Regions:
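Short alpha-helical DNA-recognition segment
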Residues: 1-18
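DNA major-groove recognition helix of helix-turn-helix/homeodomain DNA-binding modules
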Residues: 30-45, 270
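Short C-terminal boundary/hinge segments that cap the last helix of small helical domains
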Residues: 40-58
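Residue signature of alpha-solenoid helical repeat architecture, marking inter-repeat boundaries
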Residues: 55, 91-98, 132-136, 172-175, ...
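Structural register within alpha-helical repeat arrays
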Residues: 64, 104-107, 140-144, 184, ...
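Amphipathic alpha-helical segments of tetratricopeptide repeats
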Residues: 81-89, 122-129, 161-168, 201-212, ...
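Residue register of alpha-helical TPR repeats
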Residues: 97-99, 135, 139, 179, ...
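Alpha-helical adaptor scaffolds
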Residues: 137-214
Length: 270
């Protein structure tokens, strides 16, 4: 076997590695890959090791969470909470704590209760602390948008773009980040927080340039129309947003077209 000192030499300090092992520190992808190489473990082998915890995969959790939220299923949310609580006690993995925080805030929302800032702060502190954002951090941020204070959302959106740049060539990453930016724009417009939106539109357009993600391109255009409308360029903004709704009807998405129209109607002739 290899000691912690032998494994970490020249890559990270021994105290850092010990804290990482206990879940008290995050590590950059570059250093993590170097550690795997030092241990003669391929990334594929690492994935197989992770597969041992397939029953506890984040993907499975997110699918169940989505089902619960779409159906306003409080019973399922409570069951998910109990499951994640058991997993946190068993594995002491921070993701289970993050999941518990997210679930508890949605339970509060459905019960008409206030959010819990001290819990949400654990998620924002984690996001500020991580040096490189991967899929986990992007999804965590996206799933926490309803709870994070508005004044922190724009700052975290800049961090999300900058700290995930290493993955900018990945189509999956581009798709995930563009969806999250779209959700951020929606949240900021909904809360009438228009400062900095223009920069987010530029970032989204740059991300989506050259892609075939027409649905997301159309959504960004829709929000841009509302932004222009609210900023005083009424006719142009209204035309752009209505064109986006028309495209949805052409794409045979009348349900989404109605949802967009209802959102737009809130800003017409205010």
């Amino acid at each position: 076997g290899m000691t912690l000192e032998e494994a970490s030499k020249g890559i990270v300090s021994l105290p850092f590695l010990s804290k990482f092992e206990r879940g008290e520190h995050e590590i950059t992808s570059n250093k993590f890959i170097r550690l795997l190489s030092r241990l003669n473990i391929s990334y594929r082998e690492f994935e197989l090791i992770l597969g041992h915890l397939e029953g506890y995969s984040q993907t499975a959790f997110l699918q169940q969470l989505s089902t619960a939220l779409v159906n306003n299923d409080l019973a399922l949310l409570n069951q998910l909470y109990d499951d994640q609580k058991i997993l946190l006690k068993q594995y002491s993995d921070s993701r289970f704590e993050h999941n518990l925080i997210i679930i508890s805030q949605y339970i509060n929302l459905l019960n008409g209760l206030s959010f819990e800032p001290h819990k949400i702060k654990k998620i924002t502190d984690y996001l500020y602390r991580v040096e490189e954002w991967g899929e986990y951090e992007l999804v965590l941020f996206g799933n926490s948008l309803n709870f994070i204070p508005i004044e922190k959302i724009y700052n975290l959106s800049k961090i999300a773009i900058n700290r995930s740049a290493i993955f900018s060539k990945s189509p999956k990453h581009v798709n995930e980040l563009s969806i999250i930016i779209g959700n951020i724009i929606h949240t900021l417009i909904e809360n009438e927080h228009f400062d900095g939106l223009n920069n987010l539109f530029i970032q989204a357009e740059n991300l989506l340039s050259g892609t075939d993600n027409f649905a997301e391109i159309n959504r960004i255009n829709f929000y841009k129309g509302i932004y222009l409308l609210v900023q005083g360029n009424y006719d142009k903004g209204l035309s752009i947003s209505q064109q986006a709704i028309s495209i949805l009807n052409q794409m045979r998405r009348p349900d989404l077209a109605r949802e967009y129209k209802d959102f737009l109607d809130q800003y017409i002739e205010r």
